Amino acid sequence: MKRIDCFEAIAGSITDELVITNLANTANEWRAVRNHEGNLYFVGMGMVTPYAFGLSMALPNRKVIAFDGDGGILFDLSILGTIAQTGPSNLCVVVLDNEGYISTGKGSHTSSLSSGIIDIAGVARASGITNVHEVNTVDDFVGVVKNAMEGDTGPTVIIAKINNEQAFVGTSLMDGKENKYRFVRYIEETENKIILKPSAREHGEPPKADPVFSSINEDDSFGEILFDGLQENQVNFVVGLPCSGFANTIRRCLDAQSIQYVPVANEGTGVGICAGAWLGGMTPAAIMENLGLYASTYQLMRGHYTFGIPLLLISEYRGDAGETEFFGDSGDMTEPWLNASRINYRLIRDLHELKPSIRDGLRWMNFGLRPYNILVSFDLTRPMPG
């Protein structure tokens, strides 16, 4: 079956669902059959499903569809486990499996792993997702999409086995940032919320009052202060990969009612999830050691910079003075990496600076629409005894 035939068959039944598409002709074909404000096009490989997942978590009463590819889902299989563990019933992931990297052009193509023994549907089931369907006809595709849109029994993953035919329908005249604005404004209008905050105040008006911070006592731990700082600055969505320096904070986030915490197996996955959460109106933060920043480079550059999406990054400074592990040596590249990546940051060496730095970082990223990093010195995250 052809991809565009699948799209044409379901386009008329899509109403207010939000759609995230992958690259090239997948995006172009969906735009050709249903050009709508609720579509975010051209999301990079390995990021489509994380974006859609984050969006579904931010808007639990709204159906979200991901049009991913076999190459894209194979790029980050760990997102399937995250979906299974969290179970958003409003999420439908469609993997358009043509067994190759085909949609990028008119020339010869390279086969993907799904052309061999890799069974994407089997991987999804083994990850813990119950509603997994592999379809080979347009009628079957229409049926499982309809069931996913009408049901609420958990997330759905559909493997649509398409051929390698493409409909060259022309490309979009929008770049990522224009598409982002259109998409977010549509969500603001239909969800009655404010997401974009380019200015903190009207001209001539005083600045918005600072958050009220609880006092810091001498025996307060770093983890406790960071958690309080997140709450007091109204951060309500946090992703993290377990890290000794952040263990106390993560434990508190897991128990908190005011914060949605999503554990991830890869920091880059978490960055993509945060992008989707922000698009849906959440105030997200990603907690990771600085080596995790390196692992997130692709997602930050290909995603957040392409679309202009802010994110508060809170990082432990591995390789800083006091480091005791040999693998921390590469940490001294952190600040040059941040500068080269054009990520604004603040280095924190005093616990009393932590809460205000979260406040200031959120303000900066709201008008800058770019990631902001709070880099916490190693002696604060892992104080030595004595």
Predicted regions and their residues:
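Short active-site oxyanion
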Residues: 15-18, 39, 130-131, 234-238, ...
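Thiamine diphosphate
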Residues: 3-8, 29-181, 283, 302-339, ...
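N-terminal alpha/beta PP-like core and its mobile active-site loop of ThDP/TPP-dependent enzymes
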Residues: 90, 198-201, 206-385
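Active-site diphosphate/adenylate-binding microenvironment
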Residues: 1-45, 222-231
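Short glycine-enriched loops at secondary-structure junctions
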Residues: 22-26, 44-48, 97, 241-246, ...
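Glycine/aspartate-rich loop-and-adjacent alpha/beta segment that forms the canonical ThDP
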Residues: 3-4, 35, 151-213, 256, ...
